[in-house]
Amino acid sequence: SDDLSFKFKNFSQNGKDLSFQGDASVIETGVLQLNKVGNNLPDETGGIARYIAPIHIWNCNTGEVASFITSFSFFMETSANPKAATDGLTFFLAPPDSPLRRAGGYFGLFEDTKDNDSSYQTVAVEFDTIGSPVNFDDPGFPHIGIDVNRVKSINAERWNKRYGLNNVANVEIIYEASSKTLTASLTYPSDQTSISVTSIVDLKEILPEWVSVGFSGGTYIGRQATHEVLNWYFTSNLINTNS
């Protein structure tokens, strides 16, 4: 079988296991910061961090698709009005050579389009802190959504977002290949509040055989927030029936 597992209890500034695009970096505290904030930045900023090794997500010879589990903790900080702070973060699967695309509410994964574009070959779970119905065809509230080749989610659940280091969120995302079910759950351990979203997603129809996995985040001028990942665990299992 084609298995891959890795675990970051925290992140290292001189680690060699992540690659970065845009504003993503590991900061001194051992936290993966997905975007910068500050005065001398463009209107939309964002970044991507991905695991350096590609993941074999399906096998074109056998048709087998991998199941995977990933879990991570994140928090967000803002000096803006928290209600208006933008834009959120994602966990994604995409081609290993995919570029950093439009930042801000497109999370570096998509361009300025509402159309489903299969050339993106991207599946993401978004933690959208604003939910703009005008720009993104979104529900008009913060939400956790599952995105397939576009920034508009195919399914979304309302999310009462929280800011500050005392509001760490724990996330678990599970893909069950046999049922093609992708489920994302977020829990605030401080009070055990939990929400989850699930969709049927056929990874073989959407993704290339080999993908990269990682995080992206974005924000917008005047309503800036940072999106910071504290730890990350990932494991995938692709059964090779003909081996």
UniProtKB/Swiss-Prot annotation:
Keyword list, A-Z: Calcium, Glycoprotein, Lectin, Manganese, Metal-binding
Keyword Metal-binding tagged: yes
Keyword Membrane assigned: no
InterPro entries: ConA-like_dom_sf, L-lectin, Lectin_LegA_CS, Lectin_legB_Mn/Ca_BS, Legume_lectin_dom, Leguminous_Lectin
Pfam family of the protein (one): Lectin_legB
Domain of life: Eukaryota
Binding site residues for Ca(2+): 128, 135, 138
GO molecular function: carbohydrate binding; metal ion binding
Glycosylation sites: 10, 116
Binding site for Mn(2+): 126, 128, 138, 143
PANTHER family recorded: CONCANAVALIN A-LIKE LECTIN FAMILY PROTEIN, LECTIN
Summary of the function given for this chain in its UniProt record: L-fucose specific lectin.
Similarity comment text for this entry: Belongs to the leguminous lectin family.
Protein name listed in UniProt: Anti-H(O) lectin 1
